[in-house]
From Swiss-Prot:
Keywords: DNA-binding. Belongs to the AriR family. Coiled coil: none annotated. Induction: Induced by low temperature (23 degrees Celsius). Repressed by the autoinducer-2 (AI-2) and by indole. Induced by 5-fluorouracil. Strongly induced at 16 degrees Celsius. Expression has been shown to be independent of RpoS and dependent on RpoS, repressed by YcgE. At 16 degrees Celsius with blue light irradiation expression of this operon is absolutely dependent on YcgF for relief of YcgE repression. Part of the ycgZ-ymgA-ariR-ymgC operon, it probably also has its own promoter. It holds the Pfam family YmgB. The gene is ariR. It comes from Escherichia coli (strain K12). Disruption phenotype: Deletion increases biofilm formation. This is Probable two-component-system connector protein AriR. GO terms for molecular function: DNA binding; protein homodimerization activity. Probably a connector protein for RcsB/C regulation of biofilm and acid-resistance, providing additional signal input into the two-component signaling pathway. May serve to stimulate biofilm maturation, via the Rcs phosphorelay. Regulates expression of genes involved in acid-resistance and biofilm formation, including the RcsB/C two-component system. May be a non-specific DNA-binding protein that binds genes and/or intergenic regions via a geometric recognition. Also confers resistance to H(2)O(2). Homodimer. GO terms for biological process: cellular response to acidic pH; response to hydrogen peroxide; single-species biofilm formation.
Amino acid sequence: MLEDTTIHNAITDKALASYFRSSGNLLEEESAVLGQAVTNLMLSGDNVNNKNIILSLIHSLETTSDILKADVIRKTLEIVLRYTADDM
């Protein structure tokens, strides 16, 4: 996976990136989930915007059978949605 700095710089929503950057270890698991979503978007050549991050997280949520991982994905999705204006 890419370094956190690269991932945060790739996110077009700077407030969202700043939130995760400043969270430290408090959101370590959620940061890892977000990082994986951003990495997947970058590797596929998609724009790293909130809409695509949300779609990626929903896909991850739908395809995981691990209840604990699903909870972390859901928390990550909730954070991204909080930072997403009505631009969807």
